[in-house]
A protein has these predicted regions:
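Sec-dependent N-terminal signal peptides
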Residues: 4-15
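N-terminal "mature-domain start" segment
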Residues: 18-45, 143-148
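Short secondary-structure junctions
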Residues: 29-39, 76-88
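Surface-exposed amphipathic alpha-helical segments
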Residues: 30-33, 125-152
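Short, surface-exposed coil-to-beta transition loops
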Residues: 39-42, 53-55, 101-110, 119-120
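A short acidic-to-branched-hydrophobic micro-motif
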Residues: 44-71, 119-126
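Signature of long, low-cysteine stretches enriched in small and polar/charged residues
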Residues: 78-116
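Short, exposed beta-strand-loop hairpins at the edges of beta-sheets
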Residues: 97-101, 111-139
Length: 152
């Protein structure tokens, strides 16, 4: 199920040979992620664990902010993903979706502050079960700490 959801959210393109200069590709690969898109302004990687499917995108977008990126992702979710709510979190804008076709939940989080100017991180965290507030806060912090460590 997790791989199906990740596939729905990802736009698969051809890989280029030059990774963005702000990304530590070796560190990403060492942590068992699979790189999907490797372009200067759009870089994505995915991983499936026992607890969740994780899809991460680094998007270089000018003239926007984190809240707008979060709203944009919410607006382009597939029809199979029913938007449930926006969740208050200290560190990120979080949107919660239910999968109408396969069950489970998808949480999208976009950090409120950028580590690199105009580089916005978007994480899709796909689980079979609904997360409590504490579990969600822990997931947001754990994943964002890891993902932000991949930025140079």
């Amino acid at each position: 199920m997790k791989k199906i959801i990740l596939g729905l959210f990802l736009i698969l393109g051809t890989l280029s040979f030059a990774s963005p200069s702000f990304v530590d590709v070796n560190k990403i690969k060492q942590n068992s992620y699979e790189i999907r898109d490797d372009e200067d302004d759009f870089f994505t990687f995915v991983k499936s664990t026992d607890e969740a499917g994780i899809s991460v995108a680094f998007n270089v977008i000018e003239d926007t902010n984190s809240k707008e990126v979060s709203e944009m992702i919410k607006s382009i979710a597939p029809d199979s993903q029913k938007f449930l709510s926006s969740i208050n979190n200290k560190r990120a804008y979080v949107n919660k979706f239910a999968d109408n076709e396969n069950g489970g939940f998808t949480y999208n989080f976009v950090p409120k502050t950028e580590k690199i100017k105009n580089c916005y991180i978007s994480v899709l965290y796909v689980t079979d079960s609904e997360l409590s507030s504490t579990e969600l806060d822990n997931a947001v912090n754990k994943i964002l700490n890891e993902v932000e460590s991949y930025l140079k």
